[in-house]
């Protein structure tokens, strides 16, 4: 008599400690459903390898207490079920794919061996869903060491964060932290500058001015060559930034020569702007040992001031200005802190300098990082991410959907940054569209547009996509004046709603709509 296993969103048992009546889709035995057809099968259980024969596979869907479908499936996920699930209208939130996980997707979700997974996925291949289900799987299997608070997803914007926010709770896990890398950078730069231009401002400015030099300058500052220029500058800065002088305060006495030896030899590996702090602590410890007591806070402040005066400046904003001048770029305005604002092209170079000069980078509480839209991150940004997060990563995107005009393939340079510790996976199968469908749509596009009605009742979501924010705002106002029920997504939006939406191409990244009209 074959043993029957039921698989669902989560475990269900009559009482705690009893065998489940329904097994969680992430349980080891559940992998049989996704990985095998009828016939021989095996799975790795805590007790070892379990082998057997799959006699039959059935699929059920129950909604509101009623059976939607029930039939035997000879394949992993029956095509009729897949078509039914994919054929439903786009919801205002991403759907979980537990019922339709494919074998190649399941291999990614259950991968626990590779430290860094880089997934190149075509539009509609399900890469974002797969990444989120992978996080749910890892949280389930490593509960002792991995909590939701240890996971961070870097997403394109707040609307996208809202779009995916329900997936993990729906799969039985607490939500994880989500933010854009830009927002992360702005928070890290507080104390250096109070304000930064964002990526959207930079895009709008570039499109408005149509100045190729601005685009070229922005791109240059994000490339490997500029990282090399910054490293060369930092090597020379050791000599240019320091003004050594003898220290004498109470029993603390160090000659200029002694301080130079400590700086260049004993503490040579300490970050430049933290090095004198290390030397100060060394001298204070030495003196306190001889004195037999600790210095008071007031005395320590006096000593600190004497050591700090050996820096020409500790202001990273000014130091970056020197770098720009040395590299032949326009320098930063020489203004007081409150009036400083970085252009977007300078945000990540300054962040890189901060980490290299202070050493305050690693966020050890993050044990798994998810990077979505990987194609929109620069070489410099990945170098910084490698400095900050010494953890497992799931990196995903599609090089065909990049905002970068040069269409650089990030998978070419990622292994060099992460020391080859990367498993590359390609997901070519799209569940949204095909070349044949796209060609047919192009052929009948005029006829479709002449008959189409914006936001027809049978569609849950529709979008009008513009190039610039000004165009989107104007169009939104026109439609509102006509009495249309319409939503507007701008950079400050945080919720994705049903109905007709007007937005820009760069804010629509990652979202799905039933109807899309480009203006």
Predicted regions located by residue number:
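N-terminal accessory nucleic-acid engagement/regulatory domains that precede
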Residues: 1-84
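Pre-Walker A adenine-sensing motif
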Residues: 99-111
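Pre-Walker A (Motif I) flank of P-loop NTPase domains
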Residues: 113-117
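Hydrophobic anchor at the beta1->P-loop junction of P-loop NTPases
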Residues: 119-121
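Walker A (P-loop) phosphate-binding loop of P-loop NTPases
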Residues: 124
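Conserved lysine of the Walker
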Residues: 127-128
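Alpha-helical nucleic-acid-binding subdomain
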Residues: 139-369, 375-384, 392
């Amino acid at each position: 008599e074959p043993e029957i296993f039921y698989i669902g969103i989560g475990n269900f048992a009559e009482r705690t400690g009893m065998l489940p009546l329904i097994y969680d889709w992430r349980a080891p035995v559940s992998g049989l459903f996704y990985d095998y057809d009828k016939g021989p099968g095996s799975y790795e259980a805590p007790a070892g390898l379990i082998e057997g024969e799959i006699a039959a596979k059935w699929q059920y869907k129950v909604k509101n207490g009623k059976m939607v479908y029930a039939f035997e499936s000879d394949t992993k996920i029956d095509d009729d079920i897949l078509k039914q699930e994919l054929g439903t209208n786009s919801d205002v939130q991403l759907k979980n794919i537990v019922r339709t996980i494919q074998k190649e997707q399941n291999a990614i979700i259950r991968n626990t061996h590779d430290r860094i997974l880089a997934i190149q996925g075509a539009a509609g291949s399900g890469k974002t869903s797969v990444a989120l289900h992978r996080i749910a799987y890892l949280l389930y299997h490593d509960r002792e060491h991995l909590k939701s608070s240890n996971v961070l997803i870097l997403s394109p914007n707040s609307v996208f964060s809202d779009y995916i926010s329900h997936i993990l709770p729906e799969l039985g896990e607490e939500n994880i932290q989500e933010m854009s890398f830009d927002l992360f950078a702005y928070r890290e730069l507080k104390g250096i500058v109070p304000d930064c231009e964002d990526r959207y401002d930079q895009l709008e400015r570039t499109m408005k001015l149509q100045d190729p030099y601005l685009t070229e300058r922005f791109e240059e500052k994000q490339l490997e060559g500029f990282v090399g220029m910054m490293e060369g500058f930092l090597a020379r800065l050791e000599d240019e930034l320091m003004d050594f002088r003898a220290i004498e305060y109470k029993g603390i006495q160090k000659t200029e020569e002694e301080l130079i030896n400590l700086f260049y030899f004993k503490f040579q590996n300490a970050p430049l702007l933290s090095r004198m702090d290390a030397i100060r602590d060394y001298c204070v410890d030495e003196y306190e040992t001889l004195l037999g007591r600790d210095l008071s806070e007031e005395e320590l402040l006096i000593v600190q001031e004497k050591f700090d005066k050996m820096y020409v400046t500790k202001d990273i904003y000014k130091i970056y200005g020197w770098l720009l001048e040395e590299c032949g770029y326009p320098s930063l305005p020489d203004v007081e802190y409150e009036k400083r604002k970085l252009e977007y092209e300078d945000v990540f170079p300054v962040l890189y300098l901060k980490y290299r000069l202070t050493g305050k980078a690693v966020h050890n509480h993050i044990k798994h990082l998810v990077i979505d839209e990987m194609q929109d991150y620069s070489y410099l940004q990945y170098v910084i991410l490698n400095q900050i997060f010494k953890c497992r990563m799931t990196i995903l995107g599609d090089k065909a959907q990049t905002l970068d005009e040069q269409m650089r393939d990030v998978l070419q340079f990622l292994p060099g940054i992460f020391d080859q510790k990367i498993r590359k996976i390609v997901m070519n199968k799209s569940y949204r569209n095909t070349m044949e469908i796209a060609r047919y749509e192009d052929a009948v596009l005029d006829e479709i547009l002449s008959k189409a009605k914006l936001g027809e009742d049978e569609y849950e979501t529709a979008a009008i996509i513009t190039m610039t924010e000004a165009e989107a705002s104007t169009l939104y106002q026109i439609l509102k004046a006509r009495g249309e029920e319409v939503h507007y997504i701008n950079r400050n939006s945080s919720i994705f709603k049903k109905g007709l939406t007007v937005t820009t191409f760069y804010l629509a990244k990652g979202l799905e709509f039933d109807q899309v009209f480009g203006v």
